[in-house]
Amino acid sequence: GRNMIRMALISRSNAGVAIQAMTGLPFVPEISHGTVTFTDVRLRDEDILPGDGYRDYIRPFRTIEDLHVFAAIAGFIFRVSLLHGWPRVVSEQTASLIACTRALSVEDPSSPATHIALGGLQAQFSSLLSATAPLWDTVDEKTRAGWERDRALLRVSENARAKRLETAWSRFGTGQA
């Protein structure tokens, strides 16, 4: 058999849990990063999560994280589009992407169909970003600077997303490009 990773749900307030803040990333400074150290942390049986840690938690997390990032950025673009009087079609397309993101968020994050649909969502998102590029000149400097800084978040796991998409297509028996 295959080795199994066990995962536990541990509160950051548990005795023996220490979080050391790390230097922030060059984008989205509102999201903190840190290193966790566990020293003699006591676990109860109910703290151990069921199933295989890698298969059931770590692997699906990347997909769930992608969906949260897309939702957050789409929400931001929607707000900017309304505040700055962008064309209504931009707001409508962005609202559609938000609805699609929500729909995918309730699907199985391990399913090839979810990854293929996520690939389509990402393509639509890229088209929206291209279409809105000139509109950023109509927003205030602070908002535009924040967007330029934070849009790098979309590139963080693009290679991993591309590999998951390729794997999903191969599970359907096609390497369709």
Task: Report residues per predicted region.
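A short core secondary-structure module
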Residues: 1-17
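Alpha-helical interface subdomain recognition
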Residues: 67-177
